Amino acid sequence: MAHEEKRPWEFSLSLPWELIEEILSRVPPESLLRFKTVSKQWNALFRDKTFINNHKMTFRFILATKSKIYSVSIDPKIVVRELTLDIPGLESHEIPKKLVDCDKLLLCDMEKGVVLWNPWLRHSTWIDQGSNHTRMESYGIGYNNKGSYKIFAFCDRKENHTQRLLTIHDSASDAWKDREPIDNSQGKQIVHNIYTKISGVSLNGNLYLVTYFETTDLVYHLIEINSSSESVVKFCDLPCGTSNFLKDAFVLRVFEGDRFSLLKQCHATKKIEIWVSKYKINNNLDRDVEWIKFMEVSSPNLPDLVDGFDSQPSYFIEDKRLVVCSCNETGRAWIYVFGENKLISKTQIDSVVDLWPSHWTFIPSLVPVPRAQREEPAELQV
């Protein structure tokens, strides 16, 4: 009988599971996708946040200078690597004007369109800007109950640049659709009250934006753009706000995959506060979101997390640590680690030559970039 050659994963049946995990943690992420169907155990492993975080090629921040893009790994030491967008037909030197990190993918604003990108998998797709759009600015990604991805952006009306439109790209139809940015719960235009210094946050398929009421004391809250109905409604109040738009740090993020976190640093006192929503966020309107203070750091000589160009810091929370990326007063990028009411460590990123790089948080994932596919017309039933 001829010898039947075994497939690579068949040899793994006799290996200890810990050794299999160690081997897979060294496999390039784009190759892991092919192994998801090997077994339920392997598929569950690739969904495990601990496995992703411990992978040898995991990184948590993206930095962009005028000419290059970099990834920044944190544990066990800081490692900086150059990245490329790899978009066919795109000029290799073109760097995104803006990146939006949301739902384990990155959205890159380019000169004539947007790029949906998973830099960990080295997957990307190009989406043309709408023909009627000028000065388009992306705010986030969502997906509806049919699994279709949607990109949310604001743009100027071509016939009147003083008016802004909410425009939505649907991956199912590969088309942009414009709508008035009206808060359906209050009948008000929301575009002028969006806190534009930070982008949107994607959670459970919907997009959440920080807005405010212009009263004697600014009142901050979240609005929800529902990806299925495309309605815009007030979702909940935030636990705090800021009266110093330019200098205070004020950044919303997703916490533990199913809640919100909010970082605030007062420019005057340098005190840092982290608030998180106490319970999981569901897809129903929940005006009674309860916020709790997760961390407070008020020790002397804390760094100013808002740089000289008034750019907001990037951050994530892990194992009760707050990890922040921001630039100092000279324009050099630094990584700060906070915990137990103190600054634990700070490291300057010397590999990035250019001053004042832009920076974003990134959540590594094996989520493939959705491809635009036009829906075929349904067949007539006779």
From Swiss-Prot:
Segments forming domain F-box: 9-55
Keywords: Kelch repeat, Repeat
One CC-aspect GO term: vacuole
Claim: Magnesium is one of the keywords in the record: no
Kelch repeats (start-end): 150-196, 334-381
Organism superkingdom: Eukaryota
PANTHER family from the UniProt entry: BNACNNG10540D PROTEIN, F-BOX PROTEIN CPR30-LIKE
Designated name of the protein: F-box/kelch-repeat protein At3g16580
